[in-house]
Amino acid sequence: MQSPSIHRNTGSIIQPTVTPDARAATDLQERAEQPRQRSSHSLSSVGKRALKSVGKLFQKSKAPQQKAATPPTAKNVKTPPPASNVATPRNKARESGFSNSSPQNTHSAPKSILRNHPNQASSSGAQTHEIHPEAAPRKNLRVRFDLPQDRLERSPSYLDSDNPMTDEEAVANATRQFRSPDSHLQGSDGTRISMLATDPDQPSSSGSKIGDSDGPIPPREPMLWRSNGGRFELKDEKLVRNSEPQGSIQLDAKGKPDFSTFNTPGLAPLLDSILATPKQTYLAHQSKDGVHGHQLLQANGHLLHLAQDDSSLAVIRSSNEALLIEGKKPPAVKMEREDGNIHIDTASGRKTQELPGKAHIAHITNVLLSHDGERMRVHEDRLYQFDPISTRWKIPEGLEDTAFNSLSTGGNGSVYAKSDDAVVDLSSPFMPHVEVEDLQSFSVAPDNRAALLSGKTTQAILLTDMSPVIGGLTPKKTKGLELDGGKAQAAAVGLSGDKLFIADTQGRLYSADRSAFEGDDPKLKLMPEQANFQLEGVPLGGHNRVTGFINGDDGGVHALIKNRQGETHSHALDEQSSKLQSGWNLTNALVLNNNRGLTMPPPPTAADRLNLDRAGLVGLSEGRIQRWDATPECWKDAGIKDIDRLQRGADSNAYVLKGGKLHALKIAAEHPNMAFDRNTALAQTARSTKVEMGKEIEGLDDRVIKAFAMVSNKRFVALDDQNKLTAHSKDHKPVTLDIPGLEGDIKSLSLDEKHNLHALTSTGGLYCLPKEAWQSTKLGDQLRARWTPVALPGGQPVKALFTNDDNVLSAQIEDAEGKGLMQLKAGQWQRFEQRPVEENGLNDVHSRITGSNKTWRIPKTGLTLRMDVNTFGRSGVEKSKKASTSEFIRANIYKNTAETPRWMKNVGDHIQHRYQGRLGLKEVYETESMLFKQLELIHESGGRPPARGQDLKARITALEAKLGPQGATLVKELETLRDELENHSYTALMSIGQSYGKAKNLKQQDGILNQHGELAKPSVRMQFGKKLADLGTKLNFKSSGHDLVKELQDALTQVAPSAENPTKKLLGTLKHQGLKLSHQKADIPLGQRRDASEDHGLSKARLALDLVTLKSLGALLDQVEQLPPQSDIEPLQKKLATLRDVTYGENPVKVVTDMGFTDNKALESGYESVKTFLKSFKKADHAVSVNMRAATGSKDQAELAGKFKSMLKQLEHGDDEVGLQRSYGVNLTTPFIILADKATGLWPTAGATGNRNYILNAERCEGGVTLYLISEGAGNVSGGFGAGKDYWPGFFDANNPARSVDVGNNRTLTPNFRLGVDVTATVAASQRAGVVFNVPDEDIDAFVDDLFEGQLNPLQVLKKAVDHESYEARRFNFDLTAGGTADIRAGINLTEDRDPNADPNSDSFSAVVRGGFAANITVNLMTYTDYSLTQKNDKTELKEGGKNRPRFLNNVTAGGQLRAQIGGSHTAPTGTPASAPGPTPASQTAANNLGGALNFSVENRTVKRIKFRYNVAKPITTEGLSKLSKGLGEAFLDNTTKAKLAELADPLNARYTGKKPDEVIQAQLDGLEELFADIPPPKDNDKQYKALRDLKRAAVEHRASANKHSVMDNARFETSKTNLSGLSSESILTKIMSSVRDASAPGNATRVAEFMRQDPKLRAMLKEMEGSIGTLARVRLEPKDSLVDKIDEGSLNGTMTQSDLSSMLEDRNEMRIKRLVVFHTATQAENFTSPTPLVSYNSGANVSVTKTLGRINFVYGADQDKPIGYTFDGELSRPSASLKEAAGDLKKEGFELKS
């Protein structure tokens, strides 16, 4: 009889009807026989009905509001006609938190699909299940199954039944019993309980693998019907029936493969791009038409196996060489296939390789093949069967609601389904299945025996028989499991005909004979294999970890082994020899899946799509997150479901609402990890987008959120189900926004680009709350705030609000065509236009500038040829997209107004500001003077030092007892402020000590103190520096001459911040070392406002501020101590808040010193930089704005602002950069001088240039962009000699010496051809100063608006940024160039010809106008560059410096000039009449240059630098310790270590009793160090190695923090080359120099070339990078771990100096290659140089965009010389056009690349 069905939607019981069955009887004895295992059973009859029935076990739940099904009575049960195909009944909602149903299910506890028999217990852990016969209206044969044994019993009614049941009826009836209401397969409420999901991506015969997530993973489906599809025999894979013909592979004479017969559109091009690249050839192949598998033998001896049918394609590679290739010439090879093996024949013999079986292909494609050729897979908890007729996947009829975890193939060839703790054989119509509590893994042997691993802490192995029908009669055997003496836990199990294999969580292998189950010992005790089953001569575990097992087609067990590169390989376990056989790489594989017919959500609508700038596109469809895949150019499901709402934050991140909880989405570009090995890539290497559910947003407690609007994860607005609206920010408690003005309840919230909050209410109203109102934490602002109505778009009702592209507010019109999206721009509603998918503001500008420039790659080199055109002094004329001439003239030359020329105004302002300072910094200057006055008053007051125990810290501690619990907050805040002031006073004094005595020009890096605050090593240069500092103070008339050291000592004595008083101790030490300090006068004379020459004036003022505030804190303590008991302390709390947040927190000196400024000069430079760009963006006719509009194609400033925002948001890599520069200056040159009697030379030349430059650079940082605003003073001086000779007429016609033509009026036309050469030496120097800061992503829009509006002063702009650092840099260049010129010209003198009879002793002056053409070539013979850079604030310091030697032949420039000149000459007297022979007179000539020049240049430069950052050491926190412990626990998986880690993490541990929080942290850290003290860093386990390294470095920093030392954050040595081929090849000069010097370490190019030789993937990537349009290649080295340990040791004891570190970083033996990068910089430069003689003016601006074209990042483990693998990112990692086309064609056919 049939169980009742449950209606899909209502949950009501549907009672089936009963009809008589008149089928003939069959003998039950025949059905009791064991069926043959290799037989195929069609699901169209008995099997299908049985599958549909037993499939009830795995039905997906419905919503929990459905009522439980009531078991029907016998009279209501009817049997359907045998020919009918009864629909599968529905399940009631299963209570699983991981179901695919409505969100209400997400918190329900999962239950098993089977329940224990109440009267039986199973010691084995396997639960016994029975299905009892039900009453029937006639005497039918009744069969009872005792599950999972499946024991058959005859019902008493069978003997006298007139109509015994057929086999089909017996099975169908039995399976119906499985799902009857009183069956033990039911839940307690009469409904079937569904199951938890396991990881579907790694199927194995065990049903699980190591590393399976404990969390929810989509379940799988059951059972299939017999289709008309084709079937392949297991060994030779010949097609049996109904197959679409498959292509074959051909090799040409050169070994190049031809895939043209693969007729699926897009497939042949895809295979060509992966398997037939120019360098790929093959030695042999085996391929036949209509055969499922094809084989290719690679040139390196590895075998490729290509398996294709119309449901999937897979290409995998053998793990080891199938044929060992020796020598350069490979042998002649022939391949022959026989069953499941491939034979490789050479002259030296035959080698045989086993081909991958069904389980191998299923492992990577998730498509399983049954006995009769049916293909099945699980997708989104549902079973699908492939229909070869329609080439689509279909859910078998009646199984639409049946859920499974996964499918796998057993050693007997059957397909098994696992669901929670149950395993069912899907290949048998009898459906044998078994359940064991807490099932972890299972495996089925060829003889149908199954091993089931259960339990986590206490584990057991159950051995049972899975044979259909009679398997239940076989006794089960259970053994407890003990691995490695109880130290290890089992994770996976594999069973063969003779052996049991087990893998533990550490990846080690165990084995035992199956006979071990025959003994009486209740436990199976095993030790890991050491001598047997080794890989590369090493036991498994460590680098090579067993993660699971699968079965070959012969039933043998194959171990899945993950290597250190993260690749999984299958290796057959040879039980005879106890060895691993050569296997197959299952990770680096090409996989295509046909996804037609699989349930997929539709693409998200426009309203549900978010363009997240650099992060890509995401969307929401049917409650599921979708991501845009750029390869096939379509939407793909991200696997995140049950999402209620998706919204964009102002920070360009996505946030989701799920089940009333607010989460961030983690969206980032994903670049595949590639193993460093000798094989090419089969898997997709193009970048994709990775989407993961992030952490729940903090601060919402247990509230159920129903609407929200996000600025960032720290600042947002949330509305809960109680209609409570709250505003959240990082530094304040949540503020309830109970603000009037709304009508109705809020339905949705959203922000506009200004962060104004908009709300849509239930009444259809739209309202706005200004940013200032909802972000304010002041009560007064909230009381004044009010919601204001906003006009609806067109007066139409709004359905929902969104924040879409560019953070613009959008609204969806209700019931409008085309979804009716509108956006609010500039207060007006406009139709919403979706941003194009591939639009990228940064790439667009980069491409525009690149297309405008004229550059070419020189063939067979890595060099770039560049063309430049200059016309009438204007450069950049060659560009196709440049500013109009009128705009250029107004910006750089002349503005037709009465306004003072900009360059003159800038020069005047600069002189004034250097003298008086900046008006906008007046408050800072005044505060400095006031602080020094207050410090003097403390000094002069002469107060007594406090008695012992009366320091500030002790007094605050004493308040705890006085104030009690109600004063705890006040006491804590007092101590926090005191500690901050004391620590910072120490930091400020240490900063002074580090700079005092430093001689920058002498490269003296340390002052009295080194970077750690310890005394630096004394040196002559330091002593000289101290004397200079002392002398400078004495000569400085702005200095007060006071003894600041004495004033500070007196103040610290009086204030006494603590008993230790470390600042006073440090001050005493510095004084003893010769520190002499004064401070500026309170009133600076001559109107100068401040002392700009004081090196650390702001540091002194900040030190004074700290001490003055400590004095005020002491006065406040006096008031607190005088409080009577039970007094109100709120007034004092307000005073403390005012002191902390206003008096101290908003003090201008604190504000600017927190930005990293230590002196007024640096502050003014940063201020000036910001001011310059505020003016640049505000004025549309400024050179910067004009040039940017030309570069970006913007029509006006508003459009330019939008594009600049987009550019900043699209900065993706840390190496991407946007640069702006404004420059102006003056050039001086000497006239053309001819010495007396030196007509052909040598002639001296000289020149000088002075420039003022302003620079803005932007690059990506974590959570925002980093901006550099820098001012630069640059100058150069050049000098040289030239020579030349006039060759006309003699050069052309020696017999006709006439060289001039009389044109009358005493004027002469003189033609001339001249050749000349010159050598010039140039010395250039520059100094930069400025500020570096970060702008968070959410503030980019507002920051750019502030720049363009220009309403704020620079200090206000700086206050809006975060993480400021001061910037200072110096650069020195020396260049030696040689040039040659060929000049053909003609000139007419403007003055009369000199009279031959003129006085020979008189000077003569003449003028001439010339016109002509000149060709020139210039070669840079030698260049030397050195520079230093410092960025710092009081928490961090970055140092950068050049490490260059003189380099030769760096640049060649050749070109031509067409010019007109007006020149004047002075000729010195010779004393000889002109008519008489005599010496050539000396002359000086000056001329302008009007005309045009065309130049071509090639640059071949190499620059080296070191760069390192030190941070002030921080003590480890509780969160840091938890993260550290977690990492150690994940690396060390043995039970002993896990237990000890858990003990240390227990807060109730006795070792923490009575300790303060900081002491508890120290005790736990000590415990971790003790635990791992005796464990050396393992060389065979990278994860453990890294975990121990993290522990070691954390302990070093924690100890260093106690001494206030700094620790290294990162360090690098970089080599940059404009010749891209320099990445992998050395120049001839470098090779010569390397041969004559002792080079103990190979050069970078040699290392890279060796890497390329070892890895063809890497070689191909580097060749692509070298062949790109890149303009710069860079090799980055980083310290090896051994060097890091030395540096950490020096940081810990305070002896490591910057010079020491710099020297260490130059030792290549201690460095490893970290990164290889190729950039392309596109520059839009427009400059003007006035064509005037002797003195000229220059003005210009440029925009540059640097894009990372290719970047290879290496990853290292315990081996510091050989990388584990690498990633490839940058623009070249994006899918190519050909890949997109192939993937798009395949997508149309239903095939998608598996990523």
UniProtKB/Swiss-Prot annotation:
Question: In what ranges is there compositional bias, type Low complexity?
Answer: 60-75, 203-215, 1467-1487
Q: Where is this region: Disordered?
A: 1-227, 1461-1488
Q: What is the effect of changing E833A?
A: Defective in the virulence activity
Tell me what happens on changing W829A.
Defective in the virulence activity
Work out whether the entry's keyword set contains Cell wall biogenesis/degradation: no
Deleted gene: phenotype: The deletion mutant is reduced in its ability to produce lesions but not in its ability to grow in host tomato leaves. The double deletion mutant avrE-hopM1 is strongly impaired in its ability to produce lesions and grow in susceptible host tomato leaves. The double mutant is also impaired in its ability to elicit the hypersensitive response (HR) in non-host N.benthamiana leaves.
Q: Where is this motif: WxxxE 1?
A: 393-397
Q: Where is this motif: ERMRS?
A: 1787-1790
Source domain of life is Bacteria
Q: Where would you find this protein in the cell? A: Secreted; Host cell; Host cell membrane
Compositional bias segments (type: Basic and acidic residues):
129-154
Q: How is its activity regulated?
A: Polyamidoamine dendrimers inhibit channel and virulence activities.
Kindly list any coiled-coil regions of this protein: none
Query: What does the entry list under GO cellular component?
Result: extracellular region; host cell; host cell plasma membrane; membrane
User: Where does it primarily localize?
Assistant: secreted
Motif WxxxE 2, residue range(s) on this chain: 829-833
Residue ranges annotated as compositionally biased, kind Polar residues, are 1-18, 97-109, 117-127, 174-191
**Assembly, per entry:** In planta interaction assays, interacts with the A.thaliana protein phosphatase 2A (PP2A) via direct interaction/association with specific B' regulatory subunits.
Q: Which family does it belong to?
A: Belongs to the AvrE family.
What is the recorded function of this protein according to its Swiss-Prot or TrEMBL entry?
A: Major virulence factor that may function as a water- and solute-permeable channel dedicated to creating osmotic/water potential perturbation and a water- and nutrient-rich apoplast in which bacteria multiply within the infected plant tissues. Expression in Xenopus oocytes results in inward and outward currents, permeability to water and osmolarity-dependent oocyte swelling and bursting.
Record remark: domains: Contains two functional domains, one in the N-terminal one-half and the other in the C-terminal one-half, which may physically interact in vivo and are both required for full activity. Contains two WxxxE conserved motifs and a predicted C-terminal endoplasmic reticulum membrane retention/retrieval signal (ERMRS), which is present in most AvrE family proteins. The WxxxE and ERMRS motifs are required for AvrE-mediated virulence in P.syringae pv. tomato. The N-terminal domain contains a plasma membrane-targeting signal that could drive the entire protein to the host plasma membrane.
Q: What is this protein called?
A: Type III effector AvrE
Native source organism of the sequence? Pseudomonas syringae pv. tomato (strain ATCC BAA-871 / DC3000)
The organism's lineage is:
Bacteria, Pseudomonadati, Pseudomonadota, Gammaproteobacteria, Pseudomonadales
**Which gene name does the record give?**
avrE
